[in-house]
């Protein structure tokens, strides 16, 4: 049932970010985007962001957020974790998009949310004044290359994420609902690559930029 794990927007009205008018380039400039390959694609391919305000690590999972050293800074030796990077870059807010690489039939939504929360708390500990916004895991295409991934589990994880945000006083960006085709419950046509049904396309980033 594609509606089985629909998020109750009334229950989480104080947690889910409401749609708002374009906040302008200054909002983007004050924001640090953290995430997996979909975030990496934002600046490596589509120029939606720059290396100054986005850190994306291909294949990275939410559960490794606190510990995985993947960021290099000029003047510093070795690699830094994302929490360490936040402390160095000092953004006004971070928008985190993880979860696609955590999906597994042996990894429950509650375990995922708990592990991910530990990573987000590490970000807060590293730079306490930062505002936390957790982005939903994007939907899959109806045809996708990894048959171990299911849209049902994506929905379960997102439902756990909004509860995690409410429990911790963080904001939740329910972008998945905008990207979904309401008739199928999967990603709208053209919003994920036809080659794998997982990675977001340029069309989506262009639409996002127009809608912000």
Task: Locate predicted features.
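Solvent-exposed loop/turn segments at secondary-structure junctions
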Residues: 37-41, 100-104, 138-142, 177-181, ...
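Conserved small/polar residues in nucleotide/adenosyl-binding loops
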Residues: 205-212
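N-terminal, intrinsically disordered, polar/charged segments of Gram-positive cell-envelope systems
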Residues: 1-28
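Structural recognition of the beta-strand scaffold that forms the well-ordered cores
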Residues: 31-33, 93-97, 131-136, 171-174
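Active-site segments of SGNH/GDSL-like serine hydrolases
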Residues: 100-101, 124-155
